[in-house]
């Protein structure tokens, strides 16, 4: 929700700071990335995330967009090359995000959902 007079955009669970995003069953990593990119249209405003402190959009780039792009690109390439899910998950290097809260709980699950999404997209 954009509140122009306050120069604020409420981003909710599209934006994460300091913690790993939770990719959930039925979610869509590709659409999430596009939605994040669409937030750039609001320019120099303050964004209120679902998790973390309000900040400029650039503050959410690493823990949200960069992470989701890594998941999406790695899994899409793996599916395209015929790599099975376990091998794709094993070869995914998420270590640069390991200091984010929830990493131990979510990294594997997120990779699994991202692979399944990429696999489903390959049939479209």
What are these regions (language model features)?
Residues 1-34:
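Catalytic core of the metallo-beta-lactamase
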Residues 8, 30-83, 87, 91:
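Divalent-metal (often Zn2+) His-rich catalytic cores of metallo-beta-lactamase-fold enzymes
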Residues 10, 16, 67, 97, ...:
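Aromatic side chains
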Residues 80-124:
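C-terminal regulatory/interaction regions
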């Amino acid at each position: 929700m954009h509140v122009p007079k306050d120069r604020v955009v409420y981003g909710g669970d599209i934006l994460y700071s300091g913690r790993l995003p939770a990719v959930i069953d039925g979610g869509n990593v590709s659409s999430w990335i596009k939605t994040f990119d669409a937030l750039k249209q609001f320019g120099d405003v303050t964004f209120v995330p679902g998790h973390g402190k309000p900040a400029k959009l650039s503050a959410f780039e690493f823990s949200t967009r960069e992470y989701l792009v890594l998941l999406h690109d790695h899994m899409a390439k793996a599916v395209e090359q015929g790599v099975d899910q376990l091998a794709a998950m094993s070869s995914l290097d998420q270590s640069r995000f390991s200091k984010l809260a929830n990493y131990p709980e979510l990294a594997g699950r997120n990779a699994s959902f991202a692979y399944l999404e990429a696999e489903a997209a390959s049939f479209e």
